[in-house]
């Protein structure tokens, strides 16, 4: 997707809050916006339309 590896890591290495869908750092244990503890890793593959 991205043109070089560093950009891809910067874009995709995130955690997503399951409650408010905020982007968080990959080392986060709770959401920065709402404090929710359940985070999922951002999807690495694009979804089919």
Swiss-Prot record:
Matches recorded under Gene3D superfamilies: 4.10.1060.50
One BP term from GO: translation
Keywords: Ribonucleoprotein, Ribosomal protein
Lineage top rank: taxon: Archaea
Keyword set includes Ribonucleoprotein: yes
Molecular function in Gene Ontology: structural constituent of ribosome
Pfam families (alphabetical): Ribosomal_L40e
SUPFAM superfamilies named in the record: Zn-binding ribosomal proteins
GO cellular component, one term: ribonucleoprotein complex
Record has Transcription as a keyword: no
Family indicated by similarity: Belongs to the eukaryotic ribosomal protein eL40 family.
Protein name (Swiss-Prot/TrEMBL): Large ribosomal subunit protein eL40
Gene source species: Natronomonas pharaonis (strain ATCC 35678 / DSM 2160 / CIP 103997 / JCM 8858 / NBRC 14720 / NCIMB 2260 / Gabara) (Halobacterium pharaonis)
Gene name linked to the record: rpl40e
């Amino acid at each position: 997707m991205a043109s070089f590896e560093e950009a891809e890591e910067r874009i995709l290495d995130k955690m997503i809050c399951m409650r408010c869908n905020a982007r968080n750092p990959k080392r986060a244990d709770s959401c920065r916006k709402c404090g929710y503890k359940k985070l999922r890793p951002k999807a690495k593959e694009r979804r089919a339309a």
